[in-house]
Amino acid sequence: MQVERTQPLGDRIEPLGDTEGQGLTGEVELAVIGLGYVGLPLAREAVSVGLRVVGLDLDPHVVAGLNSGRSHVDDVSDDDVRRMREAGFTAYTDDACLERAQTVVICVPTPLSDDGGPDLGAVISATRAVAGRLRRGQLVVLESTTYPGTTEEVVRPLLEESGLRVGEDVALAFSPERIDPGNTRHGLRETPKVVGGCTPSCAVRAVTFYGKFVNMIVQAKGTREAEMAKLLENTYRHVNIALVNELAIISRELHVDVWDAIRCAGTKPFGFQAFRPSPGVGGHCIPIDPNYLSYKVRSSLGYEFRFVELAQEINRRMPEYVVRRAQDLLNTAGRPLHGSRVLLLGVTYKPDVADLRETPAEPVTRLLRERQAEVAFHDPHVERWSVDGVAVPRVGDLTAALREYDLTILLQDHSAYDLPTLADTAGLLFDTRGRIFKPGVEVL
């Protein structure tokens, strides 16, 4: 294990009650709370190095499926789950399993509330469950993405309601998840793990734990720095995507091929990273996490994080821009959008996964329906899909549909799609991903 530290820990590290495994009659090394796209890969990696692991999830269908050897996460196969089960992994809905663990890692969702602010309900609920089962010597780690200060200001007080003190009796740390669904090159083991402890002894415990199955640990000064690091990563992507999205809109008005400009700029070997226009941002991270940072700035400092909020405004309006371009394309072909049959290709938020969270295909569909278009979809990874509770028809014969529909919009460039064939077959094709540059194909 390689460890990179921001600064030396110093000569003095306060003792932390019982050290790992001493005085604690835990039957397992790890309990993972939340067995979704973050928690399940974490459990798999821990099991793969011989750790005894249990999982806790509120969804009885998820728990039953895992205990039957079935995965519900793209990056974890059924075979992976069966091997985990053979190694002793068990999923539970009862939080009694937590008191058996030396380490508890919280991997629950952190969505937005109805007013657009942070919704820490799942984190608070999970922390209370941990506090109710907390034992001297345990390590608790929060991996859920959140604003700086959450670990110290929300999680720590709840844990200490148990009567145990963080840094003295138990260890508490924050380590942001860096899971990239569908990425086969950079998995949990290969991706450096940022870790920040509430105290130096907490950091040592967390570094030691993750070092068992992650190749490189990056130790932050504390939990706030680790929390900010994750928000910085996602906000960086968010604002750069917004930049190229607005450039795409501007370039069209200026009669500039933005895709060629990006290609040329991308040849610079230093000082530039290429981002590309899209029909909007999706997934649980990019559309959500910058809101947590904006909230913290407004609530703690009393002013707006203008850069982030402008990026949100630009990215949120991209589905509207896509539909407007689609309408213009149909009008140029002599058809109104009203009553036209529109086929959406690829409705997941990223290529080659089945994840529909925050997909821009949803607002695109909603806007097309508002304009009385007849919408259907095709996606090799999605069998059924609905928007606002209304099912979107799925076409079975893609070749026939390409010929029959008035307009085809490529929203996601899954590798299963034969792009030249799409261009040759579709009557009218709008490529929002910049993948098909052929005469007759409209590109975002």
Region spans (language model):
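Structural/interface elements that position substrates and couple domains in central-metabolism enzymes
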Residues: 2-444
